[in-house]
Amino acid sequence: MWRDVAHGPMLWCWWGCDALAVMAVQAIRRMRGGAQSQLMLGADGNLWVVKFQNNPQHLRVLANELIVTRIAEAVGLTVPKSDVIEVSEWLVGNSPEMWVDQVRGAKARCAHGLQFGSQFVGGMMPGQVVDYLPESQMAEVRNLAEFAGMLVVDKWTGNCNGRQAVFERKARERRYRAIFIDQGFCFNAGGWDFPDAPLRGVFPRNHVYATVRGWQSFEPWLSRVENFAASKLGEIAEEVPPAWYGGDTRVLEQMMETLLQRRSRVRELVGQFRDSSRRPFPEWGKTALRPVPGHADWLGEAGKMVM
């Protein structure tokens, strides 16, 4: 069980024998969104967006967040650092803003104990973070190709929500970087099943998929998902505190087994989106132009490109 491993003020908590949780030390403000998360300062000095066990969406969204963020990290996608956050009963009781709105105008205190935390994008460093970029600026996103990779993960894990991302630009940098957030509605939120549909788990605007020309555009992420090791998935599942799924290990194991079986269906699921009426990949099947190294400048831009 979780226990204090520090002397004096509690800074860290311990789960089982090999997982540490970050202690929350201050509530900063409430965040936008249906989960009613809180921005909190951790004992590690970082800002964390914390989702609580009694959030209005479902208890299991905490498990979903941790599992899918870990999967995305493992296949090489850009996601915020995530961790288990310990929120003390004292902190909740002494932070007037730590409430969760419930039905019919009722309110409840945010749950204390083990919560899910995602590091606040941008942190305390100067820079710029936006949740929308016009199409004209999308070409300046450094990792735009990762939207295809995140689509693979969303289809594999049955994300029943639209894909969400924020765009971060560091101070004195010109280009943005996409960071994929909010994995809570993977595995159909609290359902822990997979009611697949072509337009689920996709970004709302097609231009993030402008570089997709075929299956090669989904690499290396597609191959990494199709070959995702069962042992690695088991390690990820073991990180999830049992309180986040009601302690029913059997249900978690069944969901992980289904996820392993779905690896072979990812191309089919992406193909259903490709063939949908939305036509998300207008460049599919076209060959990208590529520069010819070493050609003289007098050739001009057109002369430097080949099919």
Model-predicted segments: where are they?
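Conserved ATP-binding subdomain of kinase catalytic cores across diverse folds
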Residues: 17-131, 153-160, 176, 183-187, ...
